[in-house]
């Protein structure tokens, strides 16, 4: 995701070198930075009108932050790698304290990591921020950065509350809201959808989202790469709700006017394999009995699997995919488990079978008896039995 930043004023810079160990390997490193290969050079900016965020690396798993005097920066706790570029004594010029963002409300909204470090300095400074942060048990998985510049013209709904990794802005407004379970009547009427229709984003264990508005800069983290998708007016996109990181909205109630649950028209009956129906007698032979036993086992397993699937979908919300209606922008992350867009339905080879006694055929001999003008036709397997 390409983000352009414009900074006014004069700036002086020098370079430091960050050497990824995975890229260097057995390479001999020289005594000068200019002699070192496979390095990322970061600018140290001494004069800026406002702080600057820049995602670096490939993939961009590190955030380079250039701070300005007296402007507080909020960084996810446990993710600061380095503080550098401070003029004078570090402890005298820079201070940091713990900042909790609505801890009680965040916990019930599904944001279980709302602890940030508030960093402020009396002189310009620079930070290196890792995309991973400390958790209660170990550390989070590797993620990548995307930087958003909010100009106050549109709001962003961040579906994954834990994606907000760093931010600044005196006029930046960050609020928590409940994800609506149902779409609005107006949106249902305009889209030709029945009522009630689910939005598909609601989860019982994570029922909230973060609304970002105002002016400021926010650094988001997501699994894998982060992509920006733009939808024109009237366009729709089917998106996995696990991949949906955020979307632009017009206020806190716009989700129920733009997102609804995706339902495939493909039915499981359409995916069954057509074949000749088997008529078996389960007790005619041992093989048929084993087939009958297998049928009961598979049917019980399918019933248990469907029950678990229905329970999980009820707890999570609804299906795996949602339909998003434009005009708006979407942020999609690629590093999450994928789901199949089409409903999976395995062919049921036993439900197509009819458990009826096996029909047998045999050869018979027919004879005709004419008695007093009446004709009578009878069959016998052996003419000798007629005597």
UniProtKB/Swiss-Prot annotation:
Gene label = AIM24
Q: Which Pfam families match?
A: AIM24
Where do the coiled-coil regions begin and end? none
**Where is the protein found, in the record's own terms?**
Mitochondrion
UniProt entry keywords in alphabetical sequence: Mitochondrion, Transit peptide
Q: Where is the transit peptide?
A: 1-23
Q: Which organism is it from?
A: Meyerozyma guilliermondii (strain ATCC 6260 / CBS 566 / DSM 6381 / JCM 1539 / NBRC 10279 / NRRL Y-324) (Yeast)
Provide the protein name: Altered inheritance of mitochondria protein 24, mitochondrial
Look up the domain of life of the source: Eukaryota
Q: What's a BP term from Gene Ontology annotated to this protein? A: inner mitochondrial membrane organization
Residue ranges crossing the lipid bilayer per the database entry:
none
Q: Name one GO cellular component term.
A: mitochondrial inner membrane
Annotated family? Belongs to the AIM24 family.
